[in-house]
Each structure stands twice: as C-alpha cells, then as structure tokens.
Amino acid sequence: MAVHAYSARYEPDWPDHVFPTEKYRLVAERLRAAGKTLVEPDAATREQLLLVHTPEYLDRLERMTESPELGYMEFEVPCTRTTVEAFKLSAGGSILAARRALEDGAAGNVGGGFHHAFADRGEGFCLINDLAVLIRVLQAEGRIRRAAVIDLDLHQGNGTARIFRDDPDVYTFSMHQEHNYPVKERSTWDIGLDDYAGDDDYLPLLREAVPKILDGHKPDLVVYQAGADCYEQDKLGLLKLSKGGIAERDKIVYRACRERKLPVVTTLGGGYPVRTEDVAEIHSRSLLLLDDPPGSLT
C-alpha cells in the first residue's frame, strides 16, 4: 500500500486567496477514510534546500518573513513565517515520499509540486521547488542517478525546466496550456496545448509521449506532477478535461511505470476550481490510484 506524506502545517493561512490551501486537509481526510497511511514529514533542512536553491535566496526568504506583504510582489502569496515553514515541510514531504517510492514502488505527497520556483527566486505561488529538491537529495544520497519529471499541471513547470536545463540525467516533460502563465522555459520536451483542449485532444498525446520518455531516458525514479488545474471548471485555466479524463491521465502514467517496474512519486501541484471539493476529489483520486492493482488500470 502506498504511503502518503502529510502535515496539517501544509496549510498556511492565506485568507481570500485563489489558492485553496484547505484542499490539503480535505485530501488527507479522504485518504484516511479510505484506510490509507499518512506519515508526518520533517521539514527539509537548509543543507537539502541548498542542493537546489542559492544561499542568498534562502536568506532572503527568512528576511521577508519580517515584512510578509513583500511576498505578494514576488510570489503572489504572503511570505509569513508559517508560509515559509509550510513550503519547507512540503519539500520534506516530497523527499519522504520519494524515498518510500523507491522502497515500495509508489508513494505520494499530499502537497508539493511547486514547480515555478527557480534556484534563486520564487514566483507563481511557489517558494521552494520540492520536485527539484527531492531529485537532488536522492542523487546526493546515491539512491538514484537518473530521474524523469512528468509534469501534467496546466501551467508549464518553468522553474523545474530551468533548474535541470543542462543536466542530461534529469528529463523534464511538461504538457500544459500554451497561452497561459508562465513565460516558458525549455523543458526536455514540451507539449503546449491550445485553449479549450479536452479529453480527446489530451489523452492520445499523453499515451504516445509517456512510453517514449520512459523507454528513452530509462529513469531510476519517475516524479509525477498531478496538477488538477486542467479540470474543465478551473478558474485559472482553459483546458477542458473532465474528472474521468483526469483519472485516465493518471492511469496512463501509472500503467507505464508499472509495466516497466519504475518507482513513481506523485505530487499534487495546482488546482483552482469553483468548488474546492472538486479539487480535493481529483487530487485524492490521483493518490488513491497509486494503489490500484495493475489489471484495473485499463
């Protein structure tokens, strides 16, 4: 059974913000109701964060907690002490989940996926790039050499792409809405989708892409960014995937990993629907599918 990293402290207080931080608690409640195991992570240490982020940036984050409103100018979120600690905890959760994925074959983080953070700055609600941190930590520990990031958030993983741009051991794949935030960086492979692309546009492209990536790169670990903002009722995006289409998206990734006996760690990424219950349902299904027997992923 897949283990999932979670802390109640993942949820900073961002009143009236478009990012529904309460989704983490709602997803955790759904996982507990399904009998899943949730494990409290330790916060990522400064030493671990320095494998990705510059010391100047980490120092600036600490200073900004003295004037939290400055965070809106760079990250579009308040840079409070609880916010910074939430991001460190979420990075720790991604590290924990990645280690468990290597042991058990699959694991998830009820959080994470902050793919807009660069080595020396944050943006787009993202302060710490936990995807990059987990990869660099596992490489430093000698647990992996090669990794593949499959980023299916509606927005391109620009920070992740930039961090690994010159590293042939880390394959970055992003399939996203082309005409939307952010300014694009160059991933190993980008598929930019037209506005209003739906299930029938999206899923055939993904079915073709994922096996090519895994067979060509042969990663030791697959890092899956299972963003929910491709949902047809998302407030910040114009992709039109149904809930069933998003579940099939997840199955395509998991099926390909299982067929090749590749460990996969899942992070949640974005999701800004009209109803927070919808994003909680989508995210929890992405994590619950990690435990589906192979024969059911059809």
What annotation goes with each model-predicted range?
Residues 1-298:
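HDAC/HDAC-like amidohydrolase catalytic core signature
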